[in-house]
Amino acid sequence: LVELIGVIPALVVSALFPIVSGLHKESIDSLRKVYQASFRYLIMIALPVAVGTLLLSGHLIYTIYGDEYVKTVPALKILSLALIFIFVNYILMNILVAVNRQMTNAIMAGTCVFVNIALNVCLIPRYGYLGAGTATVITEIVLFILGLYYVAKYICKTNIVAVASKPFISVAIMGTFIVLTTARLNLAFVIILSALTYFTCLLLFRFFTKEDKMILIHLIRK
């Protein structure tokens, strides 16, 4: 299920990457703007997906896989925490490729492989698949930290508080809605209504800018 959800950032980045690569040849300032917009979009999508998966994990497992997989719910809850970083890491690594920093990506990947192996050796014997899930979360966080560092070094700094504050408040409201309605409504209705709640909050908080609209129009024309 997590792998299926992980397709979302790949689709977003694949749509934006040709623009990003082209802008690097034209202007580093334009590249920075598209990177910052891409980072915002992925944070905007990742937060509700992660929180929704966390809060609805039991219902999702039961609906999709049945009773026999209910024991995997704790693992899905843990892995849902990694989704935020999985989403954002896509753009961090691809933006470095766009500025010809493939070796930097290789260093990051090598570091994360080492971290993941070490964590698996320490955690799996004692905690089993929960330990493996925890190792995945920590590895994605390490990749996120390294990605932010190198993007700040070669392209621009990322103001995470400014980017994530409105989506964070919106997803908190969405999460409250899920908690209050899960026991009363059908799963499909909860997902649809919680998504509407989230994006309504984003609109009310004026998360979207004129530049967002311009980028969207550019993507549609492409």
Describe the residue ranges of each PLM region.
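Helix-terminus/linker motif at the lipid-water interface of multi-pass membrane proteins
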Residues: 1-5, 18-22, 58-68, 126
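Helix-loop junctions and terminal segments of transmembrane helices
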Residues: 1-40, 46, 93-98
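Short alpha-helical transmembrane interface motifs in multi-pass membrane proteins
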Residues: 1-2, 41-45, 74-78, 93, ...
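Short runs within selected transmembrane alpha-helices of multi-pass transporters and secretion channels
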Residues: 6, 10-13, 51, 55, ...
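Interhelical loop/hinge segments that connect adjacent transmembrane helices in multipass membrane
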Residues: 19, 24-33, 154-167, 214-219
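Interfacial segments at transmembrane-helix termini and the short loops linking adjacent helices
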Residues: 36, 44, 53-84
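Hydrophobic alpha-helical transmembrane segments of multipass membrane transporters and ion channels
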Residues: 40-48, 81, 85, 170-177
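Membrane-proximal transmembrane or re-entrant/amphipathic helices at the cytosolic face
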Residues: 176-222
